[in-house]
Regions:
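Core dinuclear metal-dependent hydrolase active-site scaffold
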Residues: 10-11, 21-22, 101-128
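Hydrophobic residues at beta-strand termini and immediately following loops
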Residues: 11, 98, 187
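Metallo-beta-lactamase
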Residues: 121-219
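Histidine-centered catalytic micro-motifs
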Residues: 55-65, 114-121, 174-180
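Active-site HxH/HxHxD metal-binding segment of metal-dependent hydrolases
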Residues: 16-17, 28-31, 36-112, 192-196
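Structural motif
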Residues: 3, 47, 108, 165-166
Length: 220
């Protein structure tokens, strides 16, 4: 697969510089969304005549599902993909639970599912060719935080270091928020600019995360 087989359009808004991605299979014109973080009116002018067929949810924090009902109402055949343990958290007829290692096909595009708990228990990343949609697991410049109910810093370490950083360094991450100096970045570039991606081991990562939260407190 090459980049000419699909296009990715980014829409920023929502609660806190959230990003929803609209991906189009150029061969079939089928489309999918990554998260429902922005209002339907933002993406509607860019929806093809065949319409949306899949909505992927990276995790069930409210800012990532905020506008899901709008999309489901507008596209009655829209299938919502969500981590298997959270299927009951969303109220829609057409939903498909996914688990680690699943392959999901949209048009002629295939996405691999990675369960990446830590920021939240049902956090999932989706790999499409050379790009990885990371939700709140990994941003440009840092990892996600572990301050909400269900968060686990050690789980996040394993998700990031044993799963994401094990991918080819040229893989481009597409995060769920625009928090960094630019919207997307390669894994290798991200490691170079992020102390949270330079930990020597799990304990070192836990300490770096604790230090990061202290720094945030003083900054605010």
């Amino acid at each position: 697969m090459s980049e000419t087989d699909y296009s990715v359009r980014s829409f920023k808004g929502g609660y806190d510089d959230n990003i929803t991605y609209l991906v189009t299979c150029m061969r079939t014109r089928n489309q999918f969304l990554m998260d429902a973080s922005v209002p339907l009116k933002q993406i509607l002018p860019f929806v093809s005549k065949k319409g949306l067929i899949v909505l992927f949810i990276t995790h069930t924090h409210g800012d990532h599902t905020a506008y899901m009902d709008e999309y489901v109402d507008a596209f009655p055949n829209l299938v919502v993909m969500i981590y298997k343990d959270s299927e009951d958290k969303i109220q829609t007829t057409l939903k498909r639970p996914v688990k680690h290692g699943d392959i999901v096909t949209v048009g002629q595009l295939s996405l691999e599912v990675f369960h990446t708990p830590g920021h939240y228990p049902d956090s999932v990343c989706y790999l499409l060719d050379g790009i990885l949609f990371t939700g709140d697991t990994l941003f440009v410049g840092r990892t996600g935080r572990t301050v909400s109910n269900g968060s686990d810093t050690r789980q996040l370490y394993r998700s990031v270091y044993d799963t994401i950083l094990d991918l080819p360094g040229h893989t481009i991450i597409y995060p769920g928020h625009d928090y960094g100096p630019k919207m997307t970045i390669s894994i290798d570039e991200n490691i170079a600019i992020s102390p949270l991606l330079q930990a020597e081991d799990e304990d070192d990562f836990v300490q770096r995360m604790a230090d990061y939260e202290v720094e945030r407190t003083f900054e605010n």
